[in-house]
Amino acid sequence: MEIKCHLHALKDLNLIWPLFLPLFHCVYYLYLRMAERLSITKNGAKLNEAINKTLDDIRAAGTFKEERVITSKQAAEITVQGSDEKVLNFCANNYLGLANSPDLIEAAKEALDSHGFGLASVRFICGTTDMHKELEHLIAKFHGMEDCILYSSCFDANGGFFEALFNAEDAVISDQLNHASIIDGIRLCKAQRYRYNHMDMEDLERILKETQNLRYRCIVTDGVFSMDGDVAPLKEICDLADKYNALVWIDESHSAGFFGKTGRGTPEYCGVQGRIDFIN
């Protein structure tokens, strides 16, 4: 009788255990997820430890940068968080005062009413408006160029330009003191990269001679170098470009609008308007 009961129980168990199989799978899955999460947490802790050590080293070196929070409009005099007094602003690029121009502020308000807030898309899909095209036309006309493309920042423009036009058959020849964004943009492209000594035309000519077998050569320079304020010798650069059949590209971030008799930047200032291939 006892043996029969045990056999009967085993028979019932064989019928029931498949019902618990999904539950077992769920428990096992949760266990694996918890183990994975535990591993991520441990790795995250290691990363935090490494980051904190790096930050401590930066602070110890005296190079840690706190974010400066401005509580007023951009202007020559601004107010910043943590100070009750106005301070002089020497580090913005608001050379012409356009950031706080009453006319531009009013135009921006009108644009909000007519076009709304934000584009809700990238330009390539459906984010280009008639205002973009009008401004691009006016900028191109102002500089005497064929066309213009707007970017959200000069850094983005420098990052996107070189890869779009040049490949391994080409050479980009850059002044060694060009802005970091220019250097990064050149690194992103596949062209062969060369640097000439700062504003050294003999060194530039040496590289132009060495690269004559390549498809395109593009000489790249700041118009006005933002750190030192010196002006690129554009006439000499353009003369060399003509001599060796090279292109000329300049960054006008720190000269357009106020350099030259009519504010058309270093090409006007140096008398080489019409000889520059690309202006950023």
Which residue ranges define each predicted feature?
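Conserved active-site segment immediately N-terminal to the catalytic lysine
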Residues: 245, 264-280
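Conserved PLP-anchoring active-site segment centered on the Schiff-base-forming lysine
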Residues: 161-180
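Active-site phosphate-binding strand-loop segment of PLP-dependent enzymes
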Residues: 94, 194, 198-250
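Conserved N-terminal alpha-helix of the aminotransferase class I/II PLP-enzyme fold
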Residues: 106-154
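N-terminal "arm"/small-domain region of PLP-dependent enzymes with the aminotransferase-like
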Residues: 2-36, 43, 47-117, 246, ...
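Short, small-residue-enriched loops and turns at beta-alpha junctions
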Residues: 97-98, 125-128, 180, 201-202, ...
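Short, structured coil segments at secondary-structure junctions
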Residues: 168, 188-190, 244, 274-275
